[in-house]
Amino acid sequence: MNLEPPKAEFRSATRVAGGPVTPRKGPPKFKQRQTRQFKSKPPKKGVQGFGDDIPGMEGLGTDITVICPWEAFNHLELHELAQYGII
């Protein structure tokens, strides 16, 4: 005669009986786009090239945007220039 109580069988709660065994996947990974897309159009350049009007800048030509590219956008605030990647 067996006086021991019957032992309960414990099964893993994470496994589904009869289901395939696959490793758990983490959250989906999103790739960041390399190019920015804006809903509004980027700002247009204002007055370009002051030439010899600026003291100390004589002889550099009228294409001042090479030296000071922000001068072409002097009508905008810094945060607007940064928003469009100009600075």
Swiss-Prot record:
Pfam families (alphabetical): PDE6_gamma
Region (Disordered): 1-55
Keyword RNA-binding recorded: no
Record organism: Homo sapiens
Reaction(s) this enzyme catalyzes, per UniProt: 3',5'-cyclic GMP + H2O = GMP + H(+)
Modification type N-acetylmethionine: residues: M1
Protein family membership: Belongs to the rod/cone cGMP-PDE gamma subunit family.
Basic and acidic residues composition bias: residue spans: 1-12
Protein name: Retinal rod rhodopsin-sensitive cGMP 3',5'-cyclic phosphodiesterase subunit gamma
Gene3D superfamilies, A to Z: Retinal cGMP phosphodiesterase, gamma subunit
Compositionally biased tracts (Basic residues): 26-44
Assembly and interaction partners: Oligomer composed of two catalytic chains (alpha and beta), an inhibitory chain (gamma) and the delta chain.
GO-annotated cellular components: photoreceptor disc membrane; photoreceptor outer segment membrane; plasma membrane
GO term, biological process aspect, one: positive regulation of epidermal growth factor receptor signaling pathway
Keyword Zinc-finger: no
InterPro entries xrefs: PDE6_gamma (IPR006952), PDE6_gamma_sf (IPR037030)
